[in-house]
C-alpha cells in the first residue's frame, strides 16, 4: 500500500517493511499482498523491483490500498485507512501455497484480517507452513479494525507476539486481564496463549523481550525523530532475522 503524507507518498505497510528489513540481513524474504490493476499498483511493482525486494503481489479488481498519514508534533502518526481495497482481497493461489510450505517464518498482523477474504488466506497460509516454522503476530492495532476473536485466534496460532505499550493496554482490557504492569500483562499472555516469546516496544523508553525463562530490557537510543512510521516493523524484522541466524535472545535484542 501507499502511505500518503502531506509532502508526498511512500510505500508502506507492514509486509513490505518487515520483508525489507529481514532482507538486509541476507535472508530470503517475500512481501505477500494484493494490488490493483492501476497505476498505484504498477508503481509498487516498479519500486519493489528497483529495491530488489521479492514479492508475491496478486492483481485483483480492487484499487491499490492507500493510507492518509498525519504526524503530530512528536512525529507520531495517525492513519486514515481506505476500505475495500486490494489488500482486503488477497486470494489464496497455488504459488502462495508453495511459498507457505517452504517458509521458515511469517509475520502477520490484525489489520489485513479486517476482511473475510484476506483473513481466510492469512490463516490458510499459516496452517500450511512447516511445523517448526516461526509465526510472528505483530498485532498492529489500527482504528476500529480488530475484534477480540481476531486477536485471540491470531495469538493462538502465533509463536511470538509483537505488541507496543499502547496496544497491550487495549488487549488487557479486551481480555479482562487484571494485572496492571506491562511486564505482568506480557506474562499472562505468554501463558494464556502458550507463546514462546512476547516482544513489547515502549516507544522512546525502550523494549522488553520476554520468554518463560528469560527477559531482556534495552533502552531506546536517543535519536532525532523524523517519523515513527514503520519503526515497529524495522525492529521486528531485525530481531527476527537475528533469531533465524542463530543469535541468542539478548544478542538479537541488542
What function would you assign to each model-found segment?
Residues 28-110, 131:
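Conserved N-terminal subdomain of the carbohydrate kinase-like
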Residues 7-15, 33-36, 58-61, 229-230:
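Active-site nucleophile and cofactor-binding loops and adjacent substrate-binding regions
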Residues 105, 109-188, 205-207:
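Conserved beta-alpha-beta core of the PfkB/ribokinase-like small-molecule kinase fold
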Residues 1-6:
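Positively charged, low-complexity intrinsically disordered leader regions
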Residues 17-28, 241-246:
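Alpha-helix C-terminal capping segments
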Residues 22, 164, 232:
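Short, conserved phosphate/pyrophosphate- and ester-handling motifs at nucleotide-, phospho-/glycolipid
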Residues 175, 179-254:
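Conserved phosphate-binding/catalytic region of the ribokinase-like
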Amino acid at each position: 500500500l501507499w502511505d500518503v503524507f502531506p509532502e508526498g507518498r511512500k510505500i508502506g505497510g507492514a509486509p513490505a517493511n518487515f520483508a525489507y528489513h529481514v532482507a538486509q540481513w541476507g535472508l530470503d524474504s517475500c512481501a505477500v499482498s494484493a494490488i490493483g490493476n492501476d497505476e498505484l499498483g504498477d508503481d509498487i511493482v516498479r519500486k519493489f523491483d528497483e529495491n530488489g525486494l521479492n514479492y508475491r503481489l496478486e492483481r485483483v479488481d480492487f484499487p491499490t490500498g492507500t493510507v492518509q498519514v498525519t504526524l503530530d508534533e512528536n512525529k507520531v502518526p495517525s492513519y486514515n485507512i481506505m476500505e475495500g481495497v486490494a489488500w482486503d482481497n488477497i486470494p489464496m493461489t497455488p504459488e502462495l501455497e508453495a511459498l507457505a510450505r517452504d517458509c521458515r517464518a511469517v509475520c502477520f498482523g490484525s489489520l489485513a484480517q479486517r476482511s473475510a477474504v484476506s483473513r481466510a488466506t492469512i490463516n490458510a497460509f499459516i496452517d500450511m507452513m512447516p511445523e517448526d516454522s516461526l509465526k510472528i503476530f505483530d498485532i498492529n492495532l489500527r482504528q476500529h479494525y480488530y475484534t477480540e476473536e481476531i486477536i485471540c485466534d491470531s495469538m493462538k496460532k502465533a509463536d511470538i507476539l509483537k505488541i507496543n505499550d499502547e496496544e497491550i493496554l487495549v488487549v488487557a482490557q479486551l481480555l479482562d486481564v487484571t494485572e496492571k504492569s506491562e511486564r505482568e500483562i506480557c506474562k499472562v499472555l505468554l501463558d494464556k496463549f502458550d507463546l514462546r516469546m512476547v516482544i513489547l516496544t515502549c516507544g522512546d523508553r525502550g523494549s522488553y523481550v520476554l520468554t518463560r525463562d528469560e527477559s531482556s530490557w534495552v533502552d531506546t537510543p536517543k535519536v532525532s525523530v523524523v517519523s515513527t512510521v514503520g519503526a515497529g516493523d524495522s525492529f521486528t524484522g531485525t530481531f527476527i532475522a537475528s533469531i533465524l541466524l542463530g543469535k541468542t535472545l539478548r544478542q538479537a535484542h541488542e
